[in-house]
From Swiss-Prot:
Component of the eukaryotic translation initiation factor 3 (eIF-3) complex, which is involved in protein synthesis of a specialized repertoire of mRNAs and, together with other initiation factors, stimulates binding of mRNA and methionyl-tRNAi to the 40S ribosome. The eIF-3 complex specifically targets and initiates translation of a subset of mRNAs involved in cell proliferation. Residues 219-392 form the PCI domain. It is found in: Cytoplasm. Component of the eukaryotic translation initiation factor 3 (eIF-3) complex. The eIF-3 complex interacts with pix. Interacts with mxt. Signal peptide: none annotated. This is Eukaryotic translation initiation factor 3 subunit E. Belongs to the eIF-3 subunit E family. The lineage of its organism: Eukaryota, Metazoa, Ecdysozoa, Arthropoda, Hexapoda. Keywords: Cytoplasm, Initiation factor, Protein biosynthesis. GO terms for cellular component: eukaryotic 43S preinitiation complex; eukaryotic 48S preinitiation complex; eukaryotic translation initiation factor 3 complex, eIF3e; intracellular membrane-bounded organelle.
């Protein structure tokens, strides 16, 4: 299934350190040649200051059991540079400890005033803290790096030349330390900054494309992520446009989120529209499963695609943890759609569509009706399933209307903004005629 593997594409939009978990995940699969994969990891890790990881990778390649002289020298240089940077930051070390432990210092002005008064804080100290945070990150010490990055966020002005780099670095470090709550906060902060910054159209598109890829790591690991990924990718026109323009392969993760999120079935209609629009640029078993089921009503095709989906998900680092849930919810979708069309069907026919034995299918349907509160009945004597109507709840109708209005409002706001910019540019161009 190498033809459906997105690791190579995804890594183009990730920080070097964020690619290591993906590459290590692939080492446990049989998609690519292990030797070539390890050689690529070694090539990549050599561009960082993670000397121990470099040595470990060399051992896995059977290159050497002892550290080469070149690495010994590099390690000494890394430690020396680290010590030098720590000495430069020493005057504010106590301040970062206070910030780490005290919630009262989270107000930026209060904290900066305290720094200047108690620690003789100077601008060069901020530059040193930034350099140390970046160096610690390059060494793979992500936890300690987050402390200095947080310090920089509190003290720095949003207009500082390094502020955007700090936002990206903080998000990456929190992802790599698996601090998903903080990572979500950093993701929101970074998104707000990108959306309000005075970037050119191309720059904004590039920034959003990178953020989309990084956010997938957060969304599939945070309890609220399944709702948030739908809201951001499907109902925020700027991000949907970035996906359609730069990275249509992200449709895989949006589609997965909708399938495993039973409370957001109202998003299916909008998702299917986007999948159909982008089908000429990107297709995979997950998007094709939804097309088979909701566009073509091809249940045999959906059954075959569901089988392919399992292989795709099993080999995708981002969504592998969702495998069982995806299969269960995909079967539910097949069941609901098939019963809605046919109303009365035999259990044996349904078992065939779900890739199950008749007795397993009956058991599964009974549990489904009981747990999901579906309006359906089973006639065990005749071996029939009779599906009743399942009205959309007022809450679901309200959510659907709000999402639709929100999307239209953002689209209109974007249109007005573009027209305003065009008018300003035209006025600016006309003004040159008088000189």
């Amino acid at each position: 299934m190498a033809n459906f593997d997105l690791t190579r594409i995804n890594c183009q939009f990730l920080d070097r350190h964020l690619t290591f978990p993906l590459l290590e995940f692939l080492c446990g699969k049989e998609i690519y040649n292990q030797q070539e994969l390890l050689e690529y990891i070694l090539e990549t890790v050599n561009k960082t200051n993670m000397i121990d990881y470099t040595m470990d990778t060399r051992k896995r390649l059977n290159l050497s059991q002892e550290m080469p002289e070149e690495l010994v020298q590099r390690k000494a240089e890394v430690l020396a540079t680290l010590k030098q940077l720590q000495n430069e930051v020493a005057p504010i070390m106590k301040a970062t400890d206070i910030l780490k432990n005290g919630e009262s210092m989270k107000d930026s002005k209060t904290f900066v005033n305290a720094l200047q008064k108690d620690y003789n804080f100077k601008v060069e100290h901020l530059e040193s803290a930034y350099k140390l945070a970046k160096y610690l990150y390059e060494c793979g010490n992500y936890q300690e790096s987050t402390s200095y990055l947080y310090f920089c966020l509190i003290v720095m002005s949003p207009n500082d030349k390094n502020y955007l780099n700090v936002l990206w670095g903080k998000l990456a470090a929190e992802i790599l330390t698996l601090n998903w709550n903080t990572a979500l906060e950093d993701l929101t902060r970074l998104r707000d900054y990108i959306d309000s910054a005075n970037f050119s159209t191309i720059q904004a598109l590039q920034q959003r494309t990178w953020l989309i890829h990084w956010s997938v790591l957060v969304f599939f690991n945070h309890p609220k992520g399944r709702d948030l990924i739908i809201e951001m990718f499907l109902y925020k026109p700027l991000y949907l446009n970035a996906i359609q323009t730069m990275c249509p392969h992200i449709m895989r993760y949006l589609a997965t989120a909708v399938v495993i999120n039973r409370t957001r079935r109202n998003a299916l209609k909008d998702l299917i529209k986007v999948i159909q629009q982008e089908s000429y640029t990107y297709r995979d078993p997950i998007t094709e499963f939804l097309e088979c089921l909701y566009v073509n009503f091809d249940f045999e095709g959906a059954r075959l695609k569901l089988h392919e989906c399992q292989t795709v998900i099993l080999n995708d680092f981002f969504i592998v943890a969702c495998l069982n849930e995806f299969v269960e919810d995909a079967r539910l979708m097949i069941f609901e759609t098939f019963c809605r069309i046919h109303q009365c069907i035999t259990i044996s026919m349904l078992a065939d569509k779900l890739n199950m034995k008749p007795n397993e299918a009956e058991c599964w349907i009974v549990n489904l009706i009981r747990n999901a509160r579906l309006n359906a009945k089973i006639d065990s004597k005749l071996g029939h399933v009779v599906m009743g109507t399942q009205p959309l709840s007022p809450y679901q109708q309200l959510v659907e209307k709000i999402d639709s209005l929100s999307m239209r409002s953002e689209h209109l706001a974007g249109l007005i903004e573009r027209k305003s910019k065009q008018k300003q540019n035209q006025e600016s161009a006309d003004s040159w005629k008088y000189y």
